[in-house]
Each structure stands twice: as structure tokens, then as C-alpha cells.
Amino acid sequence: MKFWEKIAGETIGAEIAEAAIVLPLMFTLLLGIYWFGRAYNIYATITHAAREGARAATASTCATCGNTALIESQVATRVAQALQASKLDPAQVTPLLPNPVLKDCQTGAAVIPACASSPAICFASNVRLNDPSTGPAACGVSVSFQYPYQFYLPFTSLNGQLIQLKADVQTTGED
């Protein structure tokens, strides 16, 4: 009986020590869930903004109605509006050249996208979106950019780590 009393007597305060170990790990896990969720939300938002820019660029043009194809600054304005609607700063956008290299729809020559200055998106129109050996060429537009995101996770190597979330959207033209 004295043996059990000795063991029970030495465990006083063990709960406090266990809590001191477990609570920081649990809080780090909860913060990680929050910050990774925020990163995913920003990724979805910038992809949506790139889609909005591509959708605006592929809208049908009509000579008699007065609308014309958009240029890169107009596409950049559409992207900026979508970013601002989601409370993201368009000034933080940096250009991203698409990979693999885009090819012209008619000639197959490499196309270097035009990059607007504010926000800094890269835009190319009349580019080939598929491999011509797989069927008829699908032509459309490409909109790409990247947005910075910084993690705040204490006790990890990710604390203060800055990553670039990439948005690269290709859309076929409307008829």
C-alpha cells in the first residue's frame, strides 16, 4: 500500500506540467488551421479575380454595338475590381509569366504576354490553349499574376514565411 501512496504522492502537479506541454501545441495547431484556411481563401480569391479578367477579355466584340476587345490595362482594372471587392490590395499583385510558354493560335510562335502596371498582371490574347495533336486548336486568353501571403505560426519554421500564391487562368473565347 505504501508503494501506491508513494507513486500517487509524486504525481501532484502532473496535470499542470501536462497542460504546459499540450496547450502550446494545441494553440499552434488551431492557429495553423486558421492561417492555412486564410491562405486557401486568398488563393481562391485571386483565382476568381483572374477568371473575372479572363472572362471580360473573352467577351464577344461587336462592330455595330461599339464594344471592342479589351487591352491589358482594362483587364487589369477588372482584376483590381474583383480583388478590392474581396478586401485584397491590388497594389501587392506582381506579374507572373505563364509556364509553359504560350503559343500564338495561328502561327504557333511563342507569345510573351503583355504585363500591365497597376495591378501588375500578365495578359495574352489569341493564344493556343491545348496541344494541336490532340484535336483542333482551342484559342483564348491567358491572365496570370501572383499575390504575397505571410504565415504567422509561432514555434514553427513557417513563422513570418512569405510565399507567393499564383493565379494562372486560361479561358477560351466566346462566340
What does each of the following model-derived ranges do?
Residues 6-9, 134, 162:
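Generic structural signal for beta-strand residues in well-ordered domains
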